[in-house]
Amino acid sequence: MAVVVDIVTLKRRLPATRLVLFAWWWTIAETGGLVVAGWLFVRGRSNDATAHYRLMGNWANWLMRGMRVCLGATIEVMGAEALEGGGSVVLSRHVSLADSLLSAWAITQCGVEPRYVLKRELLADPCLDVVGLRLPNHFLDRSAADGGEELAAIGALTRDVEPESGTVVVIFPEGTRANSAKRQRAVAKIRETSPERAARLESLTALLPIRPAGTNALLDAAPGIDVIFARHTGLDGMDTFSGMWRRLASGVGPIELSFTRVVGSEVPMGDDRLAWLDQRWLEMDAEVSKRLQQQ
């Protein structure tokens, strides 16, 4: 049926066919992940973090292979050495439905174990609901009445992360998938309380302003921890299923993922940190915008 749709609508790149193939590929990943998770439960290994991280890595690797085979994506990772040894907080750009998958694949390929701050709604995914809750992640309840409890739970993720621990904590500090309308609303909201900050962020063209609460919770709980900035291009416009359809119709193209590490001694404390984060975010925005223009 998908092939018929593509032929009737004269879609040369077969977007419907590609989406259906990837849906089947994803179904295989979900089924396999749940079977292995069930086997670990039966064997009394529900608390075996190493086994579950291995499962996560295999799951992510299978799905990224599916993106190559079914969607025609090519993937290049730059600066992967920044992940070596772990012991850091990863601040990642957020623009598509595949961002957490992309980062999980890249990080586990380096032999590092990622802990995630994700929205609770993602627990609708069966594998995340089972495996994600067995690992030290935090699924954020964005409607929680007590934001302090949520921030405390986020901070707990870095409290035992030591240098060379082989562990990183990943957060998407924009708080939602970026697009131009959200960017305008975010800057306007900041302007209500901090005109100075809004003025320096008005030049953003690809990223959203950082929502600092979660990032501060992670950094405050582990003073001196290194910070890794993760930027990627190639998934822009794929923030909705309709967006994925449009991208597939025109071609996914190359996906580039880059990591840059900043040692903890260079990360400001207190009130100076937000201006520093904003400046680094503006630098990332400029690089992302440059890459997008070249694609």
Regions found by a protein language model. Give the residues of each.
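Membrane-anchoring hydrophobic helices of lipid-metabolizing enzymes
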Residues: M1-S88, L102
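Basic, amphipathic N-terminal segments that precede the first structured/catalytic domain
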Residues: V5-R13, L135-G147, Q294
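A cross-family acyltransferase "interaction/gating" segment
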Residues: P114, L123-L135, P163, T167-M269
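A Trp-anchored, charged/polar loop motif used as the substrate-binding/catalytic surface
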Residues: G147-D160
